[in-house]
Amino acid sequence: VPGPADEPTASQADPVEGVLFDIDDTLVDLEQAMGHVLQAIPDPALSHLGDDDWVRYKALYTTDPQRHYDRFLAGELTFEEQRVHRVRHARAGFTPEPFLGRVAEAWVRDYEQLLPQHFRAYDDVVPLLDALEARGIPYGAVSNNVHDYQRAKLDRAGLQRIGVLVGIDTVGVAKPDPAIYREGARLIGAAPSRTLYVGDNRLVDAVGARDAGLIGVWLDRTGAGRDRGVDSGTGAATGAEGVPEVPCIAGLAAVLQFLPSVR
């Protein structure tokens, strides 16, 4: 994993003039929110699960190893259907009970009602936004979900100040298509080559943004060194071989290292 020595500095010919962020598991702790809700929804078929079982169950849902979210991005599933497929796969490892019909419909209703109650911004988000504003650096978000859903998520997480938001329905494509990153740069008024894009998915966020002409930075909060299935995008590679290295940071405070020095 690249370290600080691999990161650009303010001495570069083209200093950063704008910053874009992924949302899920970058600005908003979606994995924790989903974990809370998965265990909160009453499900008699899972009443026998112990603590370790719940950890594995949640991981099967949040990491989406069968890539059902990609099928949603490709138009093969609705947003609700990809959730049903993911929870069905997770449940299959712990119960033979079917997850169909009214059972699935009731689960989706409960999930949709409960999830927004748990949207929280990471502790390092607001301090970074304060610092960007103090420096006059514009910022925004580019997400692999629809605009209105993500707008509501940001607002619920207390991030109303993020005014620029590009969703997959904004330009009709998903990450890693170059158009979605470039639209974000356009909306914040920054040249792509001078725009930092920060996200938790190494391939879809950091490499995708870099390939679109931005400065891609991988946010690896856990140090796990794995690609996130939750925000995997259509066209993303599944393996690590042959993937170019990109700058890596462990928290958002490190974004300031990429910005011009305050004089």
Regions inferred by a protein language model and the residue ranges of each:
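A metal-dependent, Asp-based hydrolase signature
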Residues: 63-110
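A generic alpha-helix surface/boundary motif
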Residues: 36, 40, 81-88, 148, ...
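Surface-exposed cleft-lining segments at the edges of enzyme active sites
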Residues: 111-117
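Asp-based, Mg2+/Mn2+-dependent phosphohydrolase catalytic module
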Residues: 1-19, 31-32, 126, 130-133, ...
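A ubiquitous structural signal for well-ordered alpha-helices
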Residues: 37, 41, 57-60, 64, ...
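Short, surface-exposed acidic
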Residues: 46-59, 93-109, 161-162
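Active-site neighborhood of HAD-like aspartate-dependent phosphohydrolases
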Residues: 2-63
